[in-house]
């Protein structure tokens, strides 16, 4: 029998000791001390980071918000009814991230990136943090490319550029969501990706929007992020950040994205609810002191990047719901000061049949003018002033009928302008057709057409141009410039000769 030498034994033991590895899995664990209404307070998470993801024993995730001396305030990102006092909550060491990438196109997801459309899981290979710094001054480029909404009153008087933030503001039931849907439909073949964020909407409403987009072939380039009215406040608060994080992935890859937040009033209300439950001190209208920062850090992430970074862009259309047209309330004034202009929708106009109910008097686009195509700039230059003058004269005209010829002509032109700026639901108009009809209007070709026939004149003119002078429309579409004025004039005059008014 072979004997083992003492030296060999010691070297074997030494070898085993050297090879021995132990991994200590240290977990920072806390205990829930209070829970309710989507908020939990936990004790014992001493090293937790602000905004860190935490996991409850039920498997539901939470996010650390209040870091206090003896407890941590946590917003619960999911069903909270199964969480009890005394439950364990542990750190994950990660901050909140959402899945991003082209795999999300055509899908409906919740603010955590989980699918809601019943089409199976979303297989994405990348994630992005929901909070990320906005591009700096040197990373940006001035807005210079147009974003065509397909809505005549907006594209002509309140133009929007790629990389702009344009607020859509108005009372409930004034057609805000309709503008969003029409704008998304109009991005077909425009090399644009759309993200529609529904915050606190009824699930039936979101379902209707998704169905409309599907029927129009617009869902294939759209991501829908939905936090419905039945979801807890923390999910409503997160939804816009999820939407913009998904958009940023495309922007940093040189693509153009349109993000619609419908609407930020509900996000602010959800944030107020969350903050009050977290015992944060209330300010004006019971909103917390940082409600401005809530929206500014979101909307600053919309940008037009410079060419070195790929030249991508995020255009943001935030919605705000006003109460009885009061734009001087807290949240509306905050968002007006953050954005690059606003489109104001008025319920009076809406109910009088002017739809979309855009009030050009107090609507403005601060940077869109430099993005408007030359043809539109040329034909619609005076449209806004003409309309403002008409509204002023309209008030005077009610007092007396003995008006001089020039005033009467202005009133007639104004009536036809208002009529022509009306548009049917989900019928966005290509920019070349908008230019053609606004040219006909501003050059006086509709002055002797009865107001009731203006819309028919418009549709028949488009049919005529498409079949007889399509090269004129093609020229506007491809170059952005007005064709030879004599050609456009001749085409409209030739059409007008054959146009029969209904009273003739």
UniProtKB/Swiss-Prot annotation:
Keywords: ATP synthesis, ATP-binding, Cell membrane, CF(1), Hydrogen ion transport, Ion transport, Membrane, Nucleotide-binding, Translocase, Transport
The enzyme's E.C. designation: 7.1.2.2
Enzyme superclass (EC): translocase
Location in the cell: Cell membrane
Assembly: F-type ATPases have 2 components, CF(1) - the catalytic core - and CF(0) - the membrane proton channel. CF(1) has five subunits: alpha(3), beta(3), gamma(1), delta(1), epsilon(1). CF(0) has three main subunits: a(1), b(2) and c(9-12). The alpha and beta chains form an alternating ring which encloses part of the gamma chain. CF(1) is attached to CF(0) by a central stalk formed by the gamma and epsilon chains, while a peripheral stalk is formed by the delta and b chains.
Protein name (Swiss-Prot/TrEMBL): ATP synthase subunit alpha
Alphabetical list of InterPro entries matching this protein: ATP_synth_asu-like_sf, ATP_synth_asu_C, ATP_synth_asu_C_sf, ATP_synth_F1_a_nt-bd_dom, ATP_synth_F1_asu, ATPase_a/bsu_AS, ATPase_F1/V1/A1_a/bsu_N, ATPase_F1/V1/A1_a/bsu_N_sf
Single GO cellular component term: plasma membrane
Reaction(s) this enzyme catalyzes, per UniProt: ATP + H2O + 4 H(+)(in) = ADP + phosphate + 5 H(+)(out)
Keyword Oxidoreductase part of the UniProt annotation: no
Species this protein is from: Shouchella clausii (strain KSM-K16)
Pfam families reported for this sequence: ATP-synt_ab, ATP-synt_ab_C, ATP-synt_ab_N
Main subcellular location of this protein, as a coarse class: membrane
One GO molecular-function entry: ADP binding
Family membership: Belongs to the ATPase alpha/beta chains family.
Annotated site location: Required for activity: 363
Gene3D superfamilies with a match to the protein in the record: 2.40.30.20, ATP synthase alpha/beta chain, C-terminal domain (1.20.150.20), P-loop containing nucleotide triphosphate hydrolases (3.40.50.300)
């Amino acid at each position: 029998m072979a004997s083992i030498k003492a030296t060999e034994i010691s070297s074997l033991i030494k070898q085993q000791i050297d090879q021995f590895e132990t991994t200590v899995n240290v977990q920072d664990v806390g205990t829930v001390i209070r829970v309710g209404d989507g908020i939990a307070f936990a004790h014992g998470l001493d090293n937790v980071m602000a905004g860190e993801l935490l996991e409850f024993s039920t498997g539901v995730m939470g996010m650390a918000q209040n870091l206090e001396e003896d407890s941590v305030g946590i917003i619960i990102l999911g069903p909270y009814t199964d969480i009890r006092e005394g439950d364990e909550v542990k750190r994950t060491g990660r901050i909140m991230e959402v899945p991003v990438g082209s795999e999300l196109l055509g899908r409906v997801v919740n603010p955590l990136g989980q699918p809601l459309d019943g089409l199976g899981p979303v297989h994405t290979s990348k994630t992005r943090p929901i909070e990320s710094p906005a591009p700096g001054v040197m990373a940006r480029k001035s807005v210079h490319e147009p974003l065509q909404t397909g809505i005549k009153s907006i594209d002509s008087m309140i133009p929007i550029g790629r990389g702009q933030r344009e607020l859509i503001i108005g009372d409930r039931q004034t057609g805000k969501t309709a503008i969003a849907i029409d704008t998304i439909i109009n991005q077909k073949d425009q090399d644009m990706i759309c993200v529609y964020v529904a915050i606190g909407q009824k699930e039936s409403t979101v379902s209707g929007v998704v169905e409309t987009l599907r029927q129009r072939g617009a869902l294939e380039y759209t991501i829908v992020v939905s936090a419905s009215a039945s979801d807890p406040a923390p999910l409503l608060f997160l939804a816009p950040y999820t939407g913009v994080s998904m958009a940023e992935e495309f922007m940093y890859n040189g693509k153009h994205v349109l993000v619609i937040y419908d609407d930020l009033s509900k996000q602010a209300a959800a944030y107020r609810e969350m903050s009050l439950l977290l015992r944060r001190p209330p300010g004006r209208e019971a909103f917390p002191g940082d409600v401005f920062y809530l929206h500014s850090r979101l909307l600053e992430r919309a940008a037009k990047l410079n060419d070195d970074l790929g030249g991508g862009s995020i255009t943001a259309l935030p919605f705000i719901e006003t109460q009885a047209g009061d734009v001087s309330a807290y949240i509306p004034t905050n968002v007006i000061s953050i954005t690059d202009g606003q489109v104001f929708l008025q319920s009076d106009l809406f109910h009088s049949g002017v739809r979309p109910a855009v009030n050009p008097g107090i609507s403005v686009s601060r940077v869109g003018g430099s993005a408007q195509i030359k043809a539109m700039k040329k034909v619609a230059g005076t449209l806004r002033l003409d309309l403002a003058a008409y509204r002023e004269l309209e008030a005077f005209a009610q007092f007396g009928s003995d008006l001089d010829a020039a005033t009467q002509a202005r009133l007639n032109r104004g009536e036809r302008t208002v009529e022509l700026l009306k548009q049917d639901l989900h019928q966005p108009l290509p920019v070349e057709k908008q230019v053609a009809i606004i040219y006909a209007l501003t050059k006086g070709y509709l002055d002797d057409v009865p107001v009731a026939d203006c819309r028919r004149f418009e549709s028949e003119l488009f049919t005529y141009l498409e079949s007889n002078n399509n090269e004129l429309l093609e020229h506007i579409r491809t170059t952005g410039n007005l064709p030879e004025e004599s050609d456009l004039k001749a085409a409209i005059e030739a059409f007008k000769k054959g146009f029969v008014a209904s009273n003739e």
